[in-house]
Amino acid sequence: VEIGLSGNTTRMGRLLAPFGIRYVAVVERSTPSFSDGFDRPIGLRTRQALGSQLDLRPLATDPSVTVLVNESWMSSRAQFGSPVRLVGLDEPGELVVTDLTSGIPVLTDRRSSREQRGFVGAGEVLVAEAYDPNWRLLIGGETIFPEPSFGWAMRFDSPTSGRAALFHIRPD
C-alpha cells in the first residue's frame, strides 16, 4: 500500500492481489453523506496516487466513501491455468510485472478458518495466509507440506487432481 500511495507504481492492485484483496475502501466521513458526521478527507497526493492506478477501478458509491475494485484480484486459495512463477516472487517490483488474474479459486468449501475443502488440480496451489509449517494439504491420501511463496504466503505442490482438504494442525 505504501508503494502505491507514494506514487511509485500504477499497479497497486497487483501488489494487493497475493493477499486476496478484492476491494479497497477509502472512508472520508464517519457517516453517509446525507447525515451529520465527521469529515476526514484524504490528502491530494493520496487522491492522485489512487486515481493513477491502472488496476483499481472506482465503483459508484456514497460520496463519503470511495470503493475501488481490484482488477488484478485473485482468490486467496488459487491455482493457475497458465504457468505462473510463484517461487521467488518476494520483491514488490516482481509482483508489479506478474499477472495473477488467471488464478482459479480452489478449496472454496470453507468449513472454518482452519479447514477448507474442494477440488484442486495437479500443480501449485497458492494460499494467501502467512506462512505456517502447521498447514497441510491432503489429496489422494497424500499429505503435502507448505513451501514459502511471495516471501510470506504459502504454496503447496499437489501431485494429482481431486478432492482435497486444507487444514491447520495446532502446534503442541
Feature names for model-found ranges:
Residues 63, 75-78, 82-172:
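Active-site-proximal, structured, solvent-exposed surfaces of multi-pass membrane proteins
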